[in-house]
Amino acid sequence: MHGSPPSPRLSAWLVLAMLAMIAVPAGITLHTVHDPAVLEIPGTNPTPYGYSWSLLLFVVPIVVIGWWFLPSEGLRIPQRAFWRTIWILVPLGFGLDFFFANRFFVYPNAKATLGIGAPALGGNVPVEEYIFYFTGFLAVLLIYVWLDEYWLAVYNVSDYPSEAKHISRLLKFHLSSLIVGVVLIAAAILYKKHSQFPEGFPGYFTVLVIGGLIPSVSFFPTARRFINWRAFSLTIFMILLISMFWEATLAVPYGWWGYQQKQMMGLFIGAWAGLPIEAVTVWIAVTYGTTIVFEILKVWQASGKPARHAFLGEP
């Protein structure tokens, strides 16, 4: 006999525990590498258009889920909530790329791209950067939606419209998320000052924490009830698998993009070509924030209330 399903609060903690039970031993093992191997590249163009082709890592899941998995099962996703999430998050991603790409990243291997520049503060960046953000948000959301609506549908909220109508207001301050964010940023600053690379400020990590936790600070008490935590956890693991393959084995070793040392917190993984810890955490933040935004918009749509009443409560 199975017991009752875990509460939304416990489910959130279980997801953290699942991440930790993999991250902790992996981190300990990677830390034992004191003399990492160095990749020797004999040619000047080892990966022609490599960055461009690698975008298929997001494009293929988008096509398979959007044009095969969902239609073949006759699943109807909440279109307005889905596209509103995309139209909110993608411009934010583009904005971050425009303002911070040249501050946080470098692109040493121009031959791995199409050679088409896209505008950004401080100089053009490869157009692949903007495609990366657009397809990234779309892939994350489609994977979560498919898992929630089909593969792990038994674990979602059974009577979503009824539950949504009982929510008095969507906007609810979550102090714990704010405290976690402040502690994480303070810890990153402190770590950098005592690391081997004390110069600069952990700007990239700070942006990731703020971007990932703004939805949580504003909406987590409401969203927690509606998130399909099993679908969320599998989404994170799938995206992290794609990201680690992408960055640790291809992008950083072959110079598709790199990270500006002064803007990182100073924790680099030598066994993964010096990959900063920020590269591991970025997709956790993206998946977390995307899921909360989508569920909040989905609850609003299901409630049938005007935006002002749904988000701020009835007058």
PLM feature segments, named:
Residues 2-315:
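Aromatic-rich, lipid-facing transmembrane alpha helices and their immediate juxtamembrane interface loops
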